[in-house]
């Protein structure tokens, strides 16, 4: 209801008896929860972390590393970049409870669970960018949801300056002059491919002391799949003709 934050949920990786859940059982848990929201996300499996203060290893939900990487992403890039992958998704985990195979990761991702993947050279990595929204739209990606959260925050901060000014053409132009640069800067920083801001004011809305702005955006999607095709040509082939 707040519409101003992303909620990272914990998905259990053992049952009530402490028996490890399978990938399919984890997906079933999320499905049975009936959560359908682009303001929430979840990750799996749990991670073994080194508790240096007590000199022991402990199992923790991946939430702790996810939040760290979200903060890292905000510091080294922008909220509309995915907090995932080898650049912004590496963790401090000793190991994951389950070492996921490729088909395991695919099953989890299709089930709206972001996998904690294990790679021999870098360790455990956040390898997903999905929200818990069921419908396939731009908003079932975390970076797009966080883009909108940031844009709303920035636009709200400048729009409040106009409250109690005269509701006329001058204030409408001021609104556009404040909002357009914000979105243009996001576009320059690779968060949007295009945008448009319009004002939809009617005599009735003016009489209600309202200014109605509409923001249309084309968010930049994250790259999640790379397809590489190799072609063998004859020795005498001219690449310019291909």
Locate the predicted segments by residue.
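Structured, hydrophobic secondary-structure cores that serve as assembly/anchoring elements
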Residues: 1-242
